[in-house]
């Protein structure tokens, strides 16, 4: 149940939980009646924003609690603190749980949330691959389950659910399950069953990511970022270009030297001056990038979609395959900002990369270009 750093499935950097009853266009629908309690949201600060975005349409008398299962990573903790403040400013109750504060912390957290989860009519969750989230799912009796993770993992989650497969992150290697996987298998299987619609349970996915394989009975609601656009901006647009970083090196998918060369080449070709670091990028790698490319490294204290809406932001935003090639065009719609994506060359992949990595990453950029008409960027 505790997060092992070597286990990406368990180490979701900021599982947070939320209870929200949300409705209207671009947001999960409100249940007909009944109070709302809390449920597992999950890993990224942006998921708090998505929950708040959907919750703005909830009935005035709905009881809504956002529960943050605090991570240990300082960068993600900082972003979550800011997002928690934003949720409070919007009028929602926020409960901060030090869920990873020692060997007994998970037991205290689960015990403290059990009553809330059992009473919940609706549970809104983020990363369904998180073992913490899967464990909390076994407690709730909610009739409505909503997944609000707009990350690329959403695409894989929905596809695996449709095919009846076990939930495995795309960047993890295949093969036989390890001892921890076998130990946790009953919980994971239970969570997968609960995320399968039935006569007693409705399941919805609230996401801006493209969903091509929809499981029977699952409702897919598009997040068009209308709340983000209404709440922030419009931004001041600068003449230069900005680049969005990725943690593909940290997750063992892309070779570090190849990534550095790609960043250097793109920055020189497009006059890039700033590099918005992913919250999981290592300090050592960022120092090297700054030294060898001359880029200004920016560590955002809010999700990038909010940073971009607040501005200033470059007229061109360069990115590698990631969630932002889908979300930034929505958040910045009507501003004239161009989002350009550089595919990952197969030669950049490490020997430890999952066999599925190249196909999955190509799918992320390919669907984004089709949907949002992004401009592809290739290295000379």
Model-derived segments and their meaning:
Residues 1-11, 32-175:
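Active-site and donor-binding regions of nucleotide-sugar-utilizing enzymes
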Residues 125, 277, 319-320:
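Short beta-strand scaffold positions
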Residues 156-242:
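A nucleotide-sugar donor-handling region in carbohydrate enzymes
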Residues 351-380:
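Leloir-type glycosyltransferase catalytic cores
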């Amino acid at each position: 149940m505790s997060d092992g750093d070597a286990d990406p499935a368990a180490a979701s950097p900021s599982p947070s939980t939320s209870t929200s009853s949300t409705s209207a266009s671009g947001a999960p629908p409100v249940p007909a009646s009944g109070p709302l309690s809390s449920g597992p949201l999950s890993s990224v600060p942006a998921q708090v924003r998505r929950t708040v975005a959907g919750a703005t349409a909830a009935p005035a008398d709905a009881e809504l609690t956002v529960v943050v299962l605090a991570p240990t990573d300082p960068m993600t903790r900082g972003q979550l603190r800011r997002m928690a403040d934003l949720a409070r400013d919007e009028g929602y109750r926020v409960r901060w749980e030090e869920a990873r504060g020692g060997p007994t912390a998970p037991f205290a957290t689960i015990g403290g949330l059990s009553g809330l989860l059992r009473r919940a009519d609706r549970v809104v969750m983020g990363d369904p691959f998180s073992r913490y989230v899967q464990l909390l799912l076994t407690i709730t009796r909610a009739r409505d389950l909503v997944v609000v993770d707009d990350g690329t993992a959403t695409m894989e989650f929905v596809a695996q659910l449709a095919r009846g497969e076990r939930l495995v992150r795309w960047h993890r290697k295949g093969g036989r399950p390890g001892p921890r996987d076998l130990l946790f298998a009953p919980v994971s299987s239970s969570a997968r069953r609960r995320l399968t619609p039935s006569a007693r349970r409705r399941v919805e996915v609230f996401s801006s990511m493209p969903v091509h394989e929809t499981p029977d009975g699952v409702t897919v609601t598009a997040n068009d970022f209308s709340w983000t656009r209404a709440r922030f901006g419009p931004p001041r647009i600068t003449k230069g270009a900005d680049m969005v970083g990725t943690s593909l090196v940290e997750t063992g998918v892309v070779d570090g030297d190849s990534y550095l060369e790609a960043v250097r080449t793109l920055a020189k070709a497009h006059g890039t001056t700033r590099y918005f670091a992913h919250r999981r990028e290592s300090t050592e790698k960022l120092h090297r990038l700054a030294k060898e490319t001359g880029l200004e490294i920016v560590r955002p204290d809010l999700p990038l979609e909010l940073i971009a809406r607040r501005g200033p932001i470059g007229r061109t935003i360069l990115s590698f395959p990631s969630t932002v090639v889908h979300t930034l065009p929505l958040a910045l719609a009507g501003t004239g900002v161009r989002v350009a994506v550089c595919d990952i060359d197969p030669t950049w992949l490490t020997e430890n990369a999952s066999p599925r990595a190249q196909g999955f990453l190509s799918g992320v950029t390919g669907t984004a270009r089709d949907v949002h008409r992004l401009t592809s960027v290739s290295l000379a």
